[in-house]
Regions:
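Basic-flanked hydrophobic alpha-helices used for secretion and membrane insertion
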Residues: 315-546
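N-terminal Sec/SRP start-transfer signal
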Residues: 1-33, 197-202, 211, 246-295, ...
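Short helix-loop junctions at transmembrane helix boundaries
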Residues: 41-54, 124-156, 214-230, 595-657
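Peri-transmembrane interface segments
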Residues: 20-27, 35-67, 82-85, 93-94, ...
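Hydrophobic alpha-helical segments
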Residues: 114-258
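Short cytosolic juxtamembrane segments of multi-pass membrane proteins
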Residues: 1-6, 181-195, 561-562, 652-658
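Alpha-helical transmembrane segments
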Residues: 35-63, 233, 249-252, 285, ...
């Protein structure tokens, strides 16, 4: 026993002999280690730090590292618990054959060292090899210039080795703790230990139905983006609780109902499948719920990020309809100086275009105003209170006519209205000022907005008679109506040439002379942000998919070993191999596709809420999101079916004793 090299050799033999268990375990550990290194590399990369919009990318990659850290811990602990459960009989035999617990502990230490070395070294090697390819993909998605060269992140390698070294140490401590508390006889029989038939817990079924229904109702009845944001995590929590309750208690109730149906139950393929699932449903239900939740996470994460990226051009056109929007605040400007200041701002814009050698294709200006009102009944109150929070934008008839070419003549109490998410009567009030709707319009001038997330619940665009009406509204607003002079410009030339026009204006913007909102400048930032969203969404989707596949694989292996003796007995009492295969197919179909169908239902129920959340990022194209969600579901189903085929063969080989 004291010969050096005995335990290292025995540990290596054990790992190779149990390759069916340790192979997927080490592959998953290595893949998560590679993913963690790649995200660390992108977080600390000098190449990423040098590109425009680096702050967005590095923040997103850091967030991704946190998610991968959490899932790596869960994945390793889950896989380790499965592997050790399958090996308990083997460890018990070691004790019966003369090995003491301290010897078994040494064996576990060596096995953990081998696993850690293989996973960390393999993961780092794969991460280093793939890091440049992933970086090029990220830069391409973000519309950033491709940087050539190769670098290795030593800090990323150190972080990866430290994290996974700690996780393997944690699994070792857990395994040793279980070994110390066990007895040899328990280890010999634990792998085949069954469970009592679970009872039908009606209270849990009711709780699951109520929480799932409440989560669905919350998602289906949400009316505006900010309410969706406020209740999103509550809805997620309710659906998760409902899923676990119904899979745990509801599945048992369903199986017992099937057992009480003689026409269905007393068929060999159904009899063995239902009886087996019912006997071990407590364990199976949690695994099925985990698969369902992870599948839902994959579908939601990938579909939302893909749709955001696909709808980016539309969002840019809505947020930045002009190449350049120069904004001069008039809040602190005396009325007698407004004309001079406005003319000076207009001259600066024209001079910048001349200096850049650009032809001005569109030049227009106006003096809009905006405030926030809270609509109740037929009145907007300009002090925060209960009511529909509404962004109110004001434009005089003269400015509206100059911008649109439509001449309008309004009385002081008349307005033209364009409303979004708001229904108004023919006469409404702003504080005590009455306004009569003289007509509705659909062409209220748009302005560039530097705000990514949408503003208030509703928007109201008003064309008023003249500045006296704006002043009257401002007098009733404690915070005053925000007034500004805006110059919109469209230019000829390439994107780079338009950015060159913006640079001197941005320099003046830095001195607080005025603010400049550039379509091209913000397009760079948004492509960086949305490209990072898409990259991270797909990256995390792969992580969730890996977790799903691993749980499915281990679950089916566990089922196969537990069913092996049962099916052998069934063949001995008269079942044909064809009947055995049919019964296996019936059980595997139920185990596999119930979580997938449920995940699809979850996504369908969440669709209205997700649409509202996407509106916060200026994605209003519901059809686009529906297509992206459907495409994601189809791809996921194809992968799911592939895993199903592979797992069915593995399950069949185990049951057949191969």
């Amino acid at each position: 026993m004291r010969k050096s090299g005995f335990f290292p050799r025995l540990a290596l033999v054990n790992l190779m002999r149990n390759g069916r268990f340790y192979g997927p375990y080490l592959l998953s550990c290595g893949m998560t280690a590679a993913m963690y290194y790649i995200l660390s590399y992108l977080t600390f990369s000098d190449i990423v730090a040098s590109v425009r919009g680096a702050g967005y990318l590095q923040s997103l990659m850091y967030l991704g590292r946190l998610v991968v850290t959490l899932f790596s811990a869960v994945l390793l602990l889950y896989a380790n618990s499965f592997v050790m459960k399958r090996r308990r009989r083997e460890l018990g035999l070691y004790n019966i054959l003369g090995l003491e617990k301290r010897h078994t502990a040494r064996l576990m230490v060596w096995e953990t060292l081998y696993c850690a070395a293989a996973a960390i070294v393999g993961g780092l090697a794969a991460g280093v090899l793939l890091s440049k390819l992933v970086l090029l993909l990220l830069l391409q998605l973000s519309h950033l210039p491709v940087e050539y060269g190769f670098e290795i992140s030593l800090s990323g390698m150190a972080d990866t080795a430290a994290l996974f070294g700690f996780l393997f140490l944690l699994t070792l401590v857990w395994n040793l703790f279980g070994l110390l508390r066990s007895r040899p006889v328990e280890l010999l029989h634990s792998a085949s230990a069954g469970e009592r038939e679970p009872r039908t817990r009606r209270l849990l079924v009711v709780l699951g139905a109520v929480t799932l229904g409440a989560g669905y109702a919350t998602a289906l009845t949400v009316e505006d983006p900010f309410t969706a944001l406020a209740y999103f995590f509550l809805a997620v929590a309710l659906v998760m609780v409902g899923t676990y309750c119904l899979f745990t208690a509801g599945s048992i109730a369903l199986l017992k109902h099937l057992r009480n149906s003689p026409r269905y139950y007393y068929q060999p393929k159904h009899f063995t499948a239902v009886a087996g699932l019912l006997y071990r449903m407590k364990q199976n239900a949690v695994g099925l719920a985990n698969i369902c939740i992870l599948s839902t996470m994959v579908l939601v994460t990938v579909s939302t990020t893909v749709s955001l990226y696909a709808g980016l051009e539309g969002a840019l056109e809505r947020m930045y309809p002009y190449d350049v929007d120069v904004v001069q605040s008039l809040d602190e400007v005396p009325p007698e100086q407004e004309t001079t200041l406005n003319e000076d701002t207009l001259e600066r814009v024209q001079a910048a275009a001349a200096d850049a050698g650009r032809k001005v294709e569109l030049l227009q200006w106006s003096t809009p105003g905006d405030t926030v009102g809270y609509y109740t009944g037929n009145t907007f109150t300009l002090v925060a209170q209960e009511g529909v929070s509404t962004e109110i934008r004001l434009l005089t008839a003269d400015d509206y006519g100059r911008l649109t070419g439509h001449t309008v003549d309004l009385e002081p109490e008349e307005v033209l209205v364009q409303a979004e998410n708001l229904d108004l009567p023919d006469t409404f009030y702003i504080e005590d000022l009455p306004f009569h709707i003289a007509g509705t319009i659909m062409d209220f001038p748009r302005y560039n907005s530097s705000i990514l997330i949408s503003g208030q619940t509703a928007q109201l665009f008003l064309v008023v008679a003249d500045e006296t009406v704006v002043s009257a509204i401002s007098d009733r607003d404690a915070s005053r109506v925000h007034r500004e002079f805006r110059v919109q410009v469209d230019l000829d030339g390439t994107e780079e040439e338009k950015l060159a026009f913006v640079d001197p204006l941005l320099a003046a913007d830095a001195n607080d002379v005025y603010s400049v909102i550039s379509h091209q400048d913000n397009a760079v930032n948004l492509y960086t942000m949305y490209g990072g969203f898409l990259f991270l969404g797909v990256f995390l989707g792969l992580l969730f998919l890996l977790s799903t596949v691993l749980i499915i694989y281990y679950k089916q292996i566990s089922e196969g070993y537990e069913d092996q003796r049962r099916y052998q007995i069934m063949q001995q009492v008269g079942m044909s191999p064809r009947e055995v295969r049919s019964s296996i197919r019936s059980q595997v179909l139920l185990v596999f596709f119930l979580p997938l169908v449920t995940a699809g239902i979850h996504v369908a129920a969440a669709f209205p809420m997700l649409c509202k959340l996407l509106e916060l990022f200026n994605l209003f194209d519901v059809c686009l999101f529906a297509l992206c969600a459907a495409g994601t579901l189809l791809v996921f189903c194809a992968i799911y079916a592939l895993v199903y085929g592979l797992t069915t063969r593995t399950y069949s080989r185990i049951v057949g004793g191969q």
